[in-house]
């Protein structure tokens, strides 16, 4: 579930593939492209954790970065390739996603 269109903050970052949610998330989290994380499913290799700012919601096919808790399972998210080839900050449900800690290895 997406809570409205949110705020568009960009498009496909330079150097990212056509399907760029994983690439955009790696730039947001690590400050640069991590090629192995371009595939959304690869984020599921990180340890599971509880939702918190800076953690990542992942499933096969999509990934986004948690920014701020709204209520219940709704979080403001940095969501690259969130539709129309745009990157948005908008409210997203965590339903159907696994929350992982990309800084734990």
Where are these regions (language model features)?
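Secreted/periplasmic proteins that engage bacterial cell-wall peptidoglycan
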Residues: 1-69
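Aromatic- and glycine-rich peptidoglycan recognition patches
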Residues: 5-11, 69-105
């Amino acid at each position: 579930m997406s809570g409205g269109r949110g705020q568009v903050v960009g498009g496909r970052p330079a150097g990212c593939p056509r399907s760029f949610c994983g690439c955009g998330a790696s730039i947001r989290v690590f400050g640069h492209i991590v090629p192995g994380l371009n595939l959304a499913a690869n984020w599921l290799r990180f340890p599971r954790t509880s939702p918190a700012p800076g953690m990542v919601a992942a499933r096969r096919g999509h990934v986004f970065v948690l920014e701020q808790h709204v209520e219940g399972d709704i979080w403001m998210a940095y969501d690259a390739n969130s539709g129309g080839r745009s990157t948005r900050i908008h409210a997203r449900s965590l339903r159907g996603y696994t929350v992982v800690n990309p800084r734990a290895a």
